[in-house]
């Protein structure tokens, strides 16, 4: 018996020591990651900046520990733009090598990057693009290059733009679940996926409009950069040249050559004027951006506000990076910027399809307070719609790209009626005991009464009136003028400027330039806000690793169906009244 307990104790001790050893090993790995990410590589003469345009592009770098552990390089608009500008001004960088793949990004982001690439070429430097499989958006950016190459067995996705919306009403009905909506706005179609079985005429109209606008922008840019007729490009898309032999892509002059990976390296070496047996001095985005030196003096603050607008933080953990605009946090940040005497103007970079109407109102108010202290300019990225437009409307000046999705001035409420599921499908019975007739308003076992539905609709109506009032105040319009462009309709930036919803077409640089002008600055620096959370902060603040790993597995296995799944799942945690865009949009 004594030997038995010795063996048990020894086993337990061994397991404990193994756990300690693995924990220490994990922390050593994390220290190594932190050290490697902070190390700056020296840039040598005749170097090439390698831009990997593959995967999903975020607004800013997300410090995602799982990506770091897997050696995955994050792709962000902010870091990409900085790298191109620094490469242009660095005499040691001879050119840019675009390593293009299945890029997924907002077209508005791509518009700004394409302009930066063209500006890079104006300095006399060159750009070479290579891809094994080009997405439409990846090719759009590659068209800015001096030469475009594709693998001999590669593919170029060129078939136009389109997509499918999924409608869940009939699926939910099979389980006795019914979604009830209260909304204002003919075009406010965000609820249709839950309450309808097909697309409405109004939604089809607005969707067709922005798809046509996007496609025309892509066609015009590629036609200009590649000197190909737009009608020809449209004909190639109708024929779906994606599935044709790669040689046809060369014949259509969409690329300049079909080569293997090692062959394109020799092309780059020839461009650099070095022998084939010499190594290329490659510089990454992180290398050229280096460690940012904190801005100490007067500057313009660039505040990044992107993701769903929520009332409170949803735990994301160290393995996720679904960025959110948390109403209370953004209000605190803007209050701090108002008090900071070194901040002379604020540019808010918005990329959001909306979310909580309550949080949007709080941010609108805080921007109003911020304007009393210094100029506020909004730079709209891929989307600044519904709640995203709500908060943007109060800026002194609004800059949007022609392809930005904006407007969607409307509000809805979405409520799940689970009474049939519980009482008929599951056999659960409920008994009410109450002091007033609506005391169990929204209880799980009962449907909404006509009186309760009327109350909900009146609540949404009040929210819509406030939304229109806020837009009218911010844009110096009458409520009647706002109503004509509201009704939940989505607009492109190129339409929004005609409707006085935005002031200027352009990108982030244009917004910064306008902010400097409003603040009467001639010499200034910029600084990004809010401060990004580091790996250590993520470790200290996160205890949801299991959920994060599960989420990563779901994302990997569901693929394109992950976003609709996440939308349905997230409804349970949404504020009941939403100012939200109709859909999830990502161009590939």
Model-assigned labels for residue ranges:
Residues 297-300, 304-341, 459, 530-588:
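Intrinsic disorder and flexible/low-complexity segments
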Residues 17, 169-267, 419-499, 503-504, ...:
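Charged, glycine-interspersed solvent-exposed loop segments at helix/strand-loop junctions
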Residues 275-282, 400-401, 430-434, 480-481, ...:
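Acidic/polar loop patches that form or flank catalytic/metal-binding clefts of enzymes
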Residues 47-165, 294-421:
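Cleft-lining beta-strand/loop regions that shape enzyme active-site pockets
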Residues 304-307, 350-352, 380-382, 395, ...:
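Active-site proximal loops enriched in glycine and acidic residues that flank catalytic Cys/His/Asp
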Residues 42-45, 292-298, 424, 520, ...:
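Extracellular/periplasmic catalytic domains that process cell-envelope and extracellular macromolecules
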Residues 3-48, 59-61, 94, 119-126, ...:
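Flexible, low-complexity junctional segments that flank or bridge functional domains
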Residues 357-362, 495-498, 538-543:
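Short glycine/threonine-rich loop-to-helix capping motif typified by GTGT followed
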């Amino acid at each position: 018996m004594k030997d038995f307990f010795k063996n048990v104790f020894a086993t337990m001790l061994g397991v404990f020591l193994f756990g300690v050893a693995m924990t220490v090993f994990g922390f050593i790995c994390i220290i190594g990651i932190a050290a490697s990410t902070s190390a700056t590589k020296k840039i040598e003469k005749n170097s090439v900046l390698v831009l990997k345009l593959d995967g999903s592009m975020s607004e800013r770098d997300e410090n995602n520990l799982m990506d770091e552990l897997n050696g995955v390089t994050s792709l962000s608009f902010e870091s990409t733009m900085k790298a191109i500008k620094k490469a242009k001004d660095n005499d040691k960088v001879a050119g840019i090598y675009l390593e293009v793949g299945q890029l997924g990004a907002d077209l508005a982001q791509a518009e700004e990057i394409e302009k930066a690439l063209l500006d890079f070429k104006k300095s006399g430097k060159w750009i070479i693009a290579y891809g094994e499989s080009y997405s439409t958006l990846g090719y759009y950016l590659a068209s800015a290059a001096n030469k475009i190459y594709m693998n001999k067995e590669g593919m170029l996705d060129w078939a136009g733009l389109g997509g499918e919306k999924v409608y869940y009403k009939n699926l939910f009905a099979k389980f006795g679940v019914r979604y009830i909506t209260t909304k204002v706005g003919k075009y406010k179609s965000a609820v249709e996926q839950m309450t309808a079985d097909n697309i409405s005429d109004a939604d089809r109209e607005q969707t067709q409009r922005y798809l046509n606008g996007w496609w025309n922008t892509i066609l015009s840019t590629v036609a200009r950069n590649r000197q190909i007729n737009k009608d020809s490009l449209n004909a190639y898309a109708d024929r779906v040249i994606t599935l044709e032999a790669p040689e046809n892509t060369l014949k259509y002059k969409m690329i300049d050559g079909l080569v293997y990976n090692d062959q394109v390296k020799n092309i780059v070496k020839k461009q650099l004027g070095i022998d084939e047996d010499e190594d290329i001095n490659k510089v990454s985005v992180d290398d050229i951006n280096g460690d940012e030196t904190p801005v100490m003096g007067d500057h313009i603050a660039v505040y990044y506000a992107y993701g769903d607008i929520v009332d409170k933080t949803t735990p994301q953990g160290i393995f996720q990076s679904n960025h959110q605009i948390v109403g209370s946090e953004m209000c605190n940040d803007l209050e701090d910027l108002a008090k900071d005497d070194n901040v002379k103007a604020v540019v808010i970079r918005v990329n959001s399809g909306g979310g909580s109407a309550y949080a949007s109102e709080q941010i609108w108010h805080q921007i109003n307070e911020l304007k009393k202290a210094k100029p506020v300019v909004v730079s709209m990225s891929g989307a600044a719609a519904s709640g995203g437009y709500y908060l943007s409307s109060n800026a002194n000046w609004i800059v949007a790209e022609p392809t930005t999705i904006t407007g969607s001035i409307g509000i809805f409420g979405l409520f799940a009626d689970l009474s049939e599921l519980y009482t008929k499908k599951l056999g659960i019975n409920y008994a009410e005991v109450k002091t007033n007739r609506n005391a169990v308003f929204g209880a799980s076992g009962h449907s909404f009464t006509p009186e309760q539905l009327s109350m909900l609709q009146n609540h949404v109506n009040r929210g819509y009136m406030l939304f229109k009032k806020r837009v009218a105040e911010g844009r110096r319009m009458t409520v009647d003028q706002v109503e004509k462009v509201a009704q939940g309709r989505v607009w492109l930036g190129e339409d929004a400027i005609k409707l006085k919803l935005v002031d200027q077409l352009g990108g982030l640089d244009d917004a910064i330039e306008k902010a400097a002008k409003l603040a009467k600055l001639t010499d200034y620096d910029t600084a990004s806000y809010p401060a990004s959370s580091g790996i250590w902060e993520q470790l200290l603040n996160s205890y949801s690793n299991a959920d994060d790993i599960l989420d990563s597995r779901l994302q990997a296995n569901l693929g394109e169906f992950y976003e609709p799944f996440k939308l349905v799942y997230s409804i349970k945690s949404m504020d009941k009244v939403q100012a939200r865009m109709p859909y999830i949009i990502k161009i590939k």
